[in-house]
Amino acid sequence: MPQRILRLPEVIRCTGLSRSSIYLRMANHEFPESISLGGRAVGWLELEIAEWISDRIQQTRTTSNG
């Protein structure tokens, strides 16, 4: 299955985070790293973003139930 690359507006829509929050979390190694698409364009692997979202859900449920 081919990997899909998400651009920043899609990542913002998927995560609900702002641009600055995404880059701050990346700097703190709390968010998937972007990949270079050439020039100044970057993107994120859809699978990595989906895993990050799943991890947040799991952490929230573990914290609130445990």
Language model segments and positions:
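Polyanion-binding surface elements
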Residues: 1-27, 48, 54-57
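Residue-level signal for beta-strand positions within conserved beta-sheet cores that form or flank
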Residues: 4, 30, 40
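Intrinsically disordered, low-complexity segments
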Residues: 16-19, 32, 62
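Short, solvent-exposed alpha-helical "recognition" segments
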Residues: 28-34
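Short Lys/Arg-enriched helix C-cap and helix-to-coil transition segments
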Residues: 35-41
